[in-house]
Amino acid sequence: VASRREFTGSWEYMIDNAIFTVPIHPNWSGAALINNEGKLCGIGSLWVNDAKKSDINQLQDNADEFLKDNPKNSSGNMFVPIDLLEPIYDDLVSFGVASGEQRPWLGMYTSEIKNQLFVSGVIPGAPADLAEIEPGDIVVAINGHKVTTLSDMYKLIWSLGAAGIKIMLNLYRDSDDIDIMVKSDSRYNFMERRKKH
């Protein structure tokens, strides 16, 4: 295990205490992460460039520059901790989704660059697309609260209520500040799930 830390993805995805391993393993998707006692502790989810980033941050000021210059030293796999999956396992097997209220989802890809949040894409037909959010927009605030990291943005959006709530985005576009109201949805309404036989 190279590090344990929060992981945020551009696709409205976040895990609080993800497990990062090195060296990278090519067959990572769905792989079991077994501890020294032979117990399952994680399920393989992603290949990442910055598995050692938290350790690098302690050693030098510019971790991103180091990672760019030393990709082989930092590439690895991200595992979802098994304790996050156990409570929803039966629902996932039976229905393909956890039961209960779903988080609000906007259907946009967002990149965090130097304390700014850039919209890098929107999913056709998703709430962000219907609200006419555009690639290149900069997300400044959510419901009047300034956001500068993906983590802050996701936590704020998810704290507002269940899928279906309306969310006000303050955006910077073409040198103008604009406000756009987005009616959120559940991401599962836009995903094809496994059919139960």
Question: For each of these PLM feature ranges, what is it?
Answer:
Residues 39, 127, 152:
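Residue-level recognition of oxygen-bearing side chains
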Residues 90-97, 118, 131-134, 140-142, ...:
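PDZ-domain C-terminal substructure recognizer with occasional recognition of PDZ-binding tails
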Residues 8-20, 30, 191-195:
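Short, solvent-exposed secondary-structure boundary/capping segments
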Residues 1-7, 56-59, 153-163:
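Short, compositionally biased
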Residues 23-27, 31-32, 106-141, 145-148:
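PDZ/PDZ-like domain segments forming the peptide/carboxylate-binding groove
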Residues 5, 18, 36, 40-113, ...:
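C-terminal cap/linker of serine protease catalytic domains
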Residues 51-53, 146-153:
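Short, Lys/Arg- and Gly-enriched loop/turn segments at beta-strand edges
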Residues 1-14, 78:
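Chymotrypsin/trypsin-fold serine protease catalytic domain
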